[in-house]
Amino acid sequence: MGFDEKLFNKELAGLARKFQVSPKSCNNPEYYNEYIRYSAIGDQQKGVGVTHVLVDTESERIAGYVTLRATSLVSEGENHVKLVEPSLEIAELAVDAEFERQGIGSALIGIAIDVADELRKNYLGIRHLVVCADGSAIDFYKKLGFGELSTLYEVLHDGWNDHCDPLYITLPENITNFDP
């Protein structure tokens, strides 16, 4: 079984109809099903986020997706001055029920790290990879090296991420191939 990484677009939108997150894998599976079907392309067009998908080459099904967007971690400096550290946020990440426990989630994190590395090397500063995790996914992220935000940092909130647990990983200066 092989997978192709692709940017989600209108040509791939038809594949999203079959995408189905298992109710056992997260607290709100219908949200993730609906996001890839109805919101991902609009978010890309509005500049809100970019969605990457892994497509199973055999079945031509979307095995999983990750949506990335720019954000900042905010901390407080001397004299209560707000300091921001540029970050890349995993805004959405989901794996189809048929492809669970096959390394798809880790591969999607690898895509996010590769994008962060490309941005940092060639376009803009990125210090952290941030995710506001569904409560049922915290252990998954922690196994990959993500930690809870210390009291020094806060994630910018925009309403959608109020009921999640913010986690982050500081990216090393020289990222090599991510291997979970």
What is the predicted function of each stretch?
Residues S106:
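Residues forming the Rossmann-fold NAD(P)(H) cofactor-binding site
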Residues M1-Q102, G110-V130, D134, I138-P180:
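Non-catalytic substrate-recognition and accessory regions of acyl/acetyltransferase enzymes
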